[in-house]
Amino acid sequence: MTGAVCPGSFDPVTLGHVDVFERAAAQFDEVVVAILVNPAKKGMFDLDERIAMIEESTAHLPNLRVEAGQGLVVDFVKAQGMNAIVKGLRTGTDFEYELQMAQMNKHIAGVDTFFVATAPRYSFVSSSLAKEVAMLGGDVSELLPEPVNRRLRERTK
């Protein structure tokens, strides 16, 4: 059985993230979406809300589960009994940053990283941008899963 971890803060999860999850779920027997908590950062949505939003948005993926973690991604990956990370790439800048992280993860723990090119229709989408546009009254419904869009609209009223 092969498994992979899709790590991130997912504050909130976007359709771009879900696209990466779906593609990972098609390639691996098991996918764990790891919501990594940084205690120094205050997100718009708390951990329980993020877990619920991802679970609702990925209910159609039976081989995917959502877990919370903190610390090094590779420690989380190993604790899950896995040795692969899947990351979505939107731009060349993403690649430069993620390549360094992938090389470090391989060096310190033998964990491989698989990159998935984001679907072009989501290449500009980020959680931060979606939140900013929503807070200014813009429509981000085409960028977010419906359960997320609903919660974001409620939060930014």
Swiss-Prot record:
Keyword ATP-binding: yes
Keywords: ATP-binding, Coenzyme A biosynthesis, Cytoplasm, Magnesium, Nucleotide-binding, Nucleotidyltransferase, Transferase
Compartments, record wording: Cytoplasm
Record field: catalytic activity: (R)-4'-phosphopantetheine + ATP + H(+) = 3'-dephospho-CoA + diphosphate
Marked site positions, Transition state stabilizer: H17
GO CC field: cytoplasm
Cited Pfam families: CTP_transf_like
Name this protein carries in UniProt: Phosphopantetheine adenylyltransferase
Taxonomic path: Bacteria, Bacillati, Actinomycetota, Actinomycetes, Mycobacteriales
Protein's gene: coaD
